[in-house]
A protein has these predicted regions:
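Structural motif
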Residues: 38, 42, 100-101, 134, ...
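Short, acidic/polar
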Residues: 27-39, 86-101, 124-125, 149-153
Length: 311
């Protein structure tokens, strides 16, 4: 796919993105700074945050860190997770994000999730206004289904806008995006930047040895990943990683990035120690044979037509 995302000085967005959801929360200032520097040194140029992350601390800390490198980095944030995708909420969120990060322009602004109660024409008319004023450069959508994304793309076009980014959940154990979102994004020339390529940490192998994290601390993540077939896949991934002389997190991120539509997985962590295996995926060469072996650990979802015999 043609490079869709560049920084203000034209630097291409990196193969992986770094998500700062933990900044100012489970990662304090020092840990956040260390992870930012590690990501930067590994070649990451695409950083992702959101208006709602850690009550604004994520954006504030990221803004402080990017200042010396601003023009060569892509900074993406999200609006309207709460409060709806109304013009007033989008404008207020964008302005708050700019203020927190001390940025004149937000490289990318996502609608954080689909709002069934707001006419998307009003939402994208607001995006057009923000782009015209130089507040944003790119437009993204997050947690949209394929039909919602296609509808959004059509409405955006009415305002001479293009949706550049879509952010779905995607990992070895959460593969629904393969059915319609990934092919739709490729067809519409939208860059797919999936989140949770490690399955909430399940694919790191830490829970098998009694480790703690979001799956043990957050009921939402427990409900999302607490299935036997997922635990079995994670265990098998760890065995394959041992055989390959790598870390399961490296293989999991590299597998997600190796999909034929060339997505840009968003990696994240609480510390540099956690982050290092994911960063190693930047240079990992995923062979077709290994990709297929890992894909076979979890059944592929049926096609949208549900005619599995034709898959």
């Amino acid at each position: 796919m043609t490079q869709l995302l560049t920084s203000p000085d034209g630097t291409p967005a990196s193969r992986l993105a770094f998500g700062t959801m933990q900044f100012g929360g489970r990662a304090d200032r020092a840990a956040s700074q260390a992870m930012f520097e590690a990501a930067l040194n590994a070649g990451i140029t695409h950083f992702d945050t959101a208006h709602v992350y850690t009550d604004g601390a994520s954006e504030t800390l990221l803004g402080e860190m990017v200042k010396p490198y601003r023009d060569r980095l892509v900074i993406a944030t999200k609006a309207a997770y709460t409060g709806g995708a109304t013009p007033q909420n989008i404008r207020a969120s964008a302005e708050t994000s700019r203020s927190r990060m001390k940025l004149d322009t937000l490289d990318a602004l996502y609608l954080h999730r689909f709002d069934p109660d707001t006419d998307m024409h009003a939402s994208f008319e607001t995006f057009a206004e923000l782009k015209r004023k130089g507040v944003i450069r790119y437009i993204g959508i997050s947690n949209f289904s394929a039909w919602q994304a296609a509808k959004a793309a059509g409405i955006a076009a009415e305002f001479d806008l293009k949706i550049t980014l879509i952010q779905p959940m995607y990992s070895l154990v959460k593969r629904q995006a393969e059915v319609e979102i990934l092919p739709m994004a490729q067809d519409y020339e939208i860059l797919c930047a999936p989140y949770s390529p490690l399955g909430g940490g399940l694919l790191t192998g830490k829970y098998a040895s009694g480790g703690s994290g979001r799956l043990t601390e957050d009921d939402r993540y427990a409900a999302r990943y607490n299935f036997e077939h997922m635990r079995s896949a994670a265990a098998a991934l760890s065995e394959i990683a041992l055989r390959e002389g790598g870390h399961p997190a490296t293989l999991a991120v590299a597998w997600a990035a190796a999909h034929k539509t060339s997505p840009t997985p968003i990696i994240s962590a609480r510390s540099t120690q956690q982050l290092e295996p994911s960063l190693a995926a930047m240079d990992y060469v995923m062979t077709p044979a290994l990709y297929a072996e890992l894909a076979a650990l979890v059944p592929a979802p049926p096609p949208a037509t549900d005619r599995a015999e034709e898959q």
